[in-house]
Amino acid sequence: MTKPLPDLRAQWRLPSGALLQPQDVCSLARPQLTRGHYARDFRFFEATLLVVTCGALVVENAVGRWMLEDAGSLLAVAKNTQVNVRKTLADDGAPYTAQFLTFAPALLTEFHQRYGHMLAPASTVEVCQQISLDEGLNDSLQFCIRGIESPDVSELQHTHRALGLLLALQERGIVYSRPSAPGLAERLTQLLAKSPEQPWTAALAGRELAVSEATLRRRLADEGVSFSALLTEIRMHHAMMLLQTTHLGVSQIADACGYRALSRFSMRFRSRFGFSVQDIR
């Protein structure tokens, strides 16, 4: 039987203090905001696990509404889920802080290959699923995070730690779906997300994916995807991440997202999320 978890706020200080750690297995991000904000139609590009360490987070769409406060619970979010997100500061005015892990498709595939016989199809996360953060689950989560943070932990060890966290979630009824074979739109998403600062064109992306520009556009249309819309979506979400997890200036963030004109970047950001870049900072 699991024990309720007491106050965890003091435990959420990672050794290196790094804000963002991309990994082949999973990635760790630590958003921090001194102003609350509301973002519409925010997209989670990968299977995600969220915990709020200070302040509050409300996630909602047509399916449901979920609220996290401090470190009392976790929220599992399915890949490609779109939700409206509201982040608020703590009652005492302390900054909103959170941590979230995104799990790579290769890791989830490995998990299902090893443990798929233990999983019930009805148990998979379809949109969002919330769970109390008990002591045992927190131990698994912290162990995984320390592995991401430590340069001395090999990728193999990190994989085992991440699988251990997925098992701990599975024991509590949380299972992410097994990734399907990626279509062209998914492969393009992965390509663009790796280097959103590059001056991408459909022709250049097609060469990287070994298809002609015409074939790329035709097959994307078959999947209901526009190249320019997807590129903008990836860049805007990358901008949102950088605004919340780094101290980079707005012009630097614009450049990191492939925009040489700050005014065009600012216009795109406001159009996509409904508020200005300055509203976050």
Range-by-range predicted roles:
Residues 23-121:
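N-terminal regulatory/effector-sensing and dimerization cores
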Residues 115-142:
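Aromatic/histidine-rich interaction motifs
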Residues 132-182:
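An amphipathic alpha-helical interaction segment
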Residues 133-138, 178-200, 208-209, 229-248:
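A short, Lys/Arg-enriched amphipathic alpha-helix from helix-turn-helix/homeodomain DNA-binding modules
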Residues 203, 214, 249-251, 262-263:
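Residues within helix-turn-helix
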Residues 207, 255-256, 267, 271:
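Alpha-helical residues within the helix-turn-helix
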Residues 216, 264-265, 269:
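Short hydrophobic/aromatic patch on the recognition helix
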Residues 222-261, 281:
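Terminal helix-turn-helix DNA-binding modules in bacterial transcription factors
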